């Protein structure tokens, strides 16, 4: 029954625009849980978490971003407000280089989502941004000298120089 319930839920989850990855999923009394490799604990499996976990695997496996350099839903204070960017990646020197904002697949990516991630970047000042609902991915390169943001086709591969 347990496996059947998990399988049914996964089948109902949207097929995302990412490669296929294997996840560790289990059922609690009330929820399905997915193991978060970055936070090293089980998290309630929501549609947004489904996207976030796919993106973590994508960044680690396809873009070579070390999971040890990722922070998920870290607290960030913007004026008097507490915010939580979905994923922040740091380079080997400990400087933030990338922010991702994840939305559930049924949520449209709008100007408001880009403004949300731009607010995070006022504090973190990273060169790369990504917004995704798992189906549509948008990548941006920030130029701090010209104070401009350019959409790019894809993220670079993580290197020691990144």
Question: What does each model-identified segment do?
Answer:
Residues 1-3, 47:
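Intrinsically disordered regions, especially transient/low-confidence alpha-helical propensity segments
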């Amino acid at each position: 029954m347990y496996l059947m319930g998990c399988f049914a839920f996964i089948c109902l989850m949207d097929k995302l625009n990412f490669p296929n990855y294997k996840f560790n999923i289990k059922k609690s009394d009330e929820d399905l849980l997915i193991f978060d490799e970055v936070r090293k604990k089980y998290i309630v499996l929501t549609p947004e978490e489904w996207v976030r976990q796919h993106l973590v695997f994508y960044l680690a496996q396809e873009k070579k971003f070390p999971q040890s350099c990722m922070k998920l839903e870290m607290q960030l204070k913007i004026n008097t407000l507490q915010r939580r960017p979905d994923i922040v990646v740091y380079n080997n020197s400990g400087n933030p280089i990338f922010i991702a904002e994840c939305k559930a697949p049924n949520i449209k990516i709008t100007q408001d989502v880009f403004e949300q991630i731009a607010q995070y970047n006022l504090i973190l000042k990273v060169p790369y941004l990504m917004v995704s609902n798992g189906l549509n991915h948008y990548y941006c390169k920030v130029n701090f000298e010209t104070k401009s943001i350019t959409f790019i086709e894809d993220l670079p591969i993580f290197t020691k120089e990144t």
